[in-house]
């Protein structure tokens, strides 16, 4: 039986990992060690560990890495602390493999700690491109440390091979977000109203704004102000706003959004974290999705919901026909919002086709984890790039 350690640090990542965690926990040939860290353990991010506890999943360890009193701590210091904390954990609890999702700086730090102890890494969602975020180079660094890859679409899978990853280690399984949308039971609109305390029977938009973190990123406060100005200028929709993430500048974005909601109680409401079920239920009912979260470009095509993607944070990702991209300036955002709310664009959005539909994505990941030979040395591949298809069945 293989011992698989799965790390979760944020609400969004846990929502994606949840079916994988559940299937690893239920598998006869895999043993789950679930480690909760990062924003899950912070009050300012909503103590989202409570969602994991409510799901009844066994938590092997809770490892704090953020300074609760210092939301503006330099990322480099958090990375250093995370490496130290997880090096200690891996020294005492060495798994057969560590399963990581995505590209955040704390996940990069966990990968560094695992690689330094020669613990094999399996990586979900490598090969993507996000030119507007520092996640871009964290993601590709994790790729080079990983022994096994689960990209979410054919384009990302091919990119991994071009980066030197051997095709036999690259399994194009589709997107976990797409699987969640198709399989997770949703709340009714009435249940959403009762759960959030807001009148969501009226047309509403989901708004999530994170700071851009690339070297060329603008001032997060100015970007948040631009979004607020655009929302104020566009009538006829209720703005359901969620909190920002743990990136540098995230606290500023959250404060700006909270202030906007407080100043416009009839037109906007703020919830730090909707959680997976409420978020997907809201996305199913929403008139549009607004902001610069990856879910706005990765998950909304499955619903065919109109989306306004602001700024450069998601630059480089596949942009489907339901997504309008605009600059992070109030006039551009306002124009995009108005266009996204037209019947003409709504019809275009509803016809979108997701490139991330892989069927039983979480099941594929679990089957590969159980069968993959993690003892095999990693090589650098210089050969041709095979054709990938997320809907294709998996075989080792």
Residue positions per predicted region:
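Active-site and donor-binding regions of nucleotide-sugar-utilizing enzymes
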Residues: 7-8, 14-25, 65-167
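A nucleotide-sugar donor-handling region in carbohydrate enzymes
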Residues: 8, 41-43, 145-222, 377
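Conserved nucleotide-sugar phosphate-binding/catalytic loop shared by glycosyltransferases and other
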Residues: 30-78, 85
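A donor-sugar binding/catalytic signature common to diverse glycosyltransferases
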Residues: 100-101, 108, 149, 275-321
């Amino acid at each position: 039986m293989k011992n698989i350690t799965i790390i979760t640090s944020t609400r969004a990542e846990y929502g994606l990992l949840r079916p994988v965690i559940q299937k690893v926990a239920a598998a006869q040939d895999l043993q789950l060690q679930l480690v909760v860290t990062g924003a899950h353990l912070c009050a300012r991010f909503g103590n989202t560990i409570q969602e994991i506890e409510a799901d009844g999943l066994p938590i092997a360890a809770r490892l704090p890495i953020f300074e609760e009193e210092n939301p503006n701590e330099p990322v480099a210091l958090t990375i250093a602390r995370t490496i130290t904390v997880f090096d200690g954990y891996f020294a005492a609890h060495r798994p057969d493999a560590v399963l990581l999702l995505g590209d955040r700086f704390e996940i990069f730090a966990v990968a560094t700690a695992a690689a330094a102890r020669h613990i094999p890494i399996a990586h979900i969602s490598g090969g993507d491109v996000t030119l507007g975020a520092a996640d871009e180079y964290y993601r590709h660094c994790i790729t080079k440390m990983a022994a096994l890859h689960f990209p979410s679409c054919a384009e990302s899978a091919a990119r991994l091979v071009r980066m030197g990853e051997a095709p036999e280690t690259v399994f194009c399984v589709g997107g976990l977000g797409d699987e969640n949308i198709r399989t997770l039971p949703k709340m009714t609109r009435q249940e959403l109203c009762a759960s959030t305390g807001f009148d969501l029977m009226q047309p509403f938009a989901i708004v999530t704004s994170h700071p851009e973190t690339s070297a060329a990123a603008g001032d997060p406060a100015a970007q948040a102000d631009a979004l607020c100005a655009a929302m104020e200028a566009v009538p006829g929709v209720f703005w359901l706003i969620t909190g920002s993430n743990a990136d540098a500048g995230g606290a500023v974005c959250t404060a700006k959004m909270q202030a906007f909601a407080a100043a416009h109680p009839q037109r906007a409401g703020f919830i730090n974290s909707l959680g997976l079920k409420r978020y997907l239920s809201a996305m199913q009912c929403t008139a549009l999705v607004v902001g610069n979260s990856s879910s706005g470009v990765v998950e909304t095509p499955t619903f065919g919901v109109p989306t306004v993607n602001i700024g450069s944070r998601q630059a480089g990702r596949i942009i489907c026909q339901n997504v309008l991209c605009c600059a992070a300036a109030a006039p551009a955002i306002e124009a995009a919002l108005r266009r996204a709310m037209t019947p003409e664009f709504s019809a275009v959005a509803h016809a979108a086709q997701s490139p991330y539909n892989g069927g039983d994505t979480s099941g594929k990941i679990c089957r590969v984890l159980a069968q993959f030979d993690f003892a095999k040395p990693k090589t650098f591949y210089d050969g041709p790039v095979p054709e990938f298809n997320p809907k294709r069945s998996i075989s080792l």
